[in-house]
Amino acid sequence: MARIAGVDLPSNKRIVIGLTYIFGIGKTSSQNILKKAGIDESIRVKDLSDEHEAAIRRVIEESYQVEGDLRSEVNLNIKRLMDVGCYRGFRHRRGLPVNGQRTRTNARTRKGVKKTVANKKKATK
């Protein structure tokens, strides 16, 4: 099991898929990393040599922001939006969808479980 950027890659998967377990690296980025490092995409993680691992680490450190650094940058960007007081920051603060999606129905993932509102009872005559 190879450990790259603080993440244990699953040893039975191909390296092109294994690299996507790192936050900030998708399939295309993974393919580009392997191309720069000169490693075949079909190699399994368990078959990687130490030189291959070192080459992958070097390419990732030079060219990509991954894991903790990327997470903290994303959180700082969201915090900046909230501090500035813009519309997107307001939506983040309220826990609502940010990119213009409808909220009359749906948006359950962002809003959370329904909060039932009690009806006022009508006065009887």
Curated annotation (Swiss-Prot):
Domain of life: Bacteria
InterPro entries linked: Rbsml_uS13_C, Ribosomal_uS13, Ribosomal_uS13-like_H2TH, Ribosomal_uS13_bac-type, Ribosomal_uS13_CS
Gene Ontology CC, one term: cytosol
Keywords assigned by UniProt, alphabetized: Ribonucleoprotein, Ribosomal protein, RNA-binding, rRNA-binding, tRNA-binding
SUPFAM superfamilies reported for this sequence: S13-like H2TH domain
NCBIfam families assigned: uS13_bact (TIGR03631)
Region annotated Disordered, chain positions: 95-125
UniProt record, GO biological process: translation
Feature: compositional bias, Basic residues: 105-125
Family under the similarity heading: Belongs to the universal ribosomal protein uS13 family.
Function, in words: Located at the top of the head of the 30S subunit, it contacts several helices of the 16S rRNA. In the 70S ribosome it contacts the 23S rRNA (bridge B1a) and protein L5 of the 50S subunit (bridge B1b), connecting the 2 subunits; these bridges are implicated in subunit movement. Contacts the tRNAs in the A and P-sites.
Subunit organization: Part of the 30S ribosomal subunit. Forms a loose heterodimer with protein S19. Forms two bridges to the 50S subunit in the 70S ribosome.
Pfam family, one: Ribosomal_S13
Protein name, per record: Small ribosomal subunit protein uS13
PANTHER family attached to this UniProt entry: 30S RIBOSOMAL PROTEIN S13/40S RIBOSOMAL PROTEIN S18 (PTHR10871), SMALL RIBOSOMAL SUBUNIT PROTEIN US13M (PTHR10871:SF1)
